[in-house]
């Protein structure tokens, strides 16, 4: 029996969050127990978030991205300069988000090849519509979720230098 394909993405969880990713990388390097992890994230609030729920949500998203990378990347993220840390956080996001990879391989590549000076905001919606043929569950996602994911993708691309601005999508 053929298994139905589904995108497994955490892009609604936030952009690169480099500062927070550095902290999470350090926690991963410390090999904390689940109890120690919870203590650091929710009680000590090492990510400095307003609520324990926000801290847990961000930490979980970042952890899922970074756990796909080798520990050497965690060290580079934690100890490297801002540019290196941003690149490593982006690598983690790419490893975790096939949708992001495919968006870059198709939409962003086409924009570069055609020397487009900016991206239109609707390209994310069109991209998701195209991908819904591969994963029909995308049609069930809330419009607000799709929009938030697009905002996060454009913010990531700006943070890593592929776009100059998230306002004009240049």
Regions found by a protein language model. Name each.
Residues 89-91, 95-118:
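Positively charged, polyanion-binding regions of nucleic-acid-associated proteins
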């Amino acid at each position: 029996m053929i298994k139905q394909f589904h995108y497994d993405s955490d892009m609604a969880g936030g952009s690169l969050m480099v500062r927070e990713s550095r902290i999470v990388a350090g926690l991963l390097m410390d090999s904390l127990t689940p109890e120690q992890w919870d203590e650091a994230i929710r009680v000590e609030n090492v990510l400095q978030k307003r609520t324990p729920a926000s801290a847990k949500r961000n930490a979980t998203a970042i952890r899922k991205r970074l756990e796909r990378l080798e520990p050497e990347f965690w060290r580079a993220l934690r100890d490297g300069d801002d540019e290196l840390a941003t690149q490593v956080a982006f690598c983690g996001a790419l490893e975790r988000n096939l949708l992001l990879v495919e968006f870059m391989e198709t939409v962003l590549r086409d924009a570069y090849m055609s020397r487009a000076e900016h991206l239109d905001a609707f390209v994310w919606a069109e991209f998701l519509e195209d991908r819904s043929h591969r994963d029909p569950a995308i049609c069930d996602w809330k419009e607000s979720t799709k929009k938030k994911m697009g905002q996060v993708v454009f913010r990531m691309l700006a943070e890593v230098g592929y776009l100059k601005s998230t306002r004009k999508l240049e």
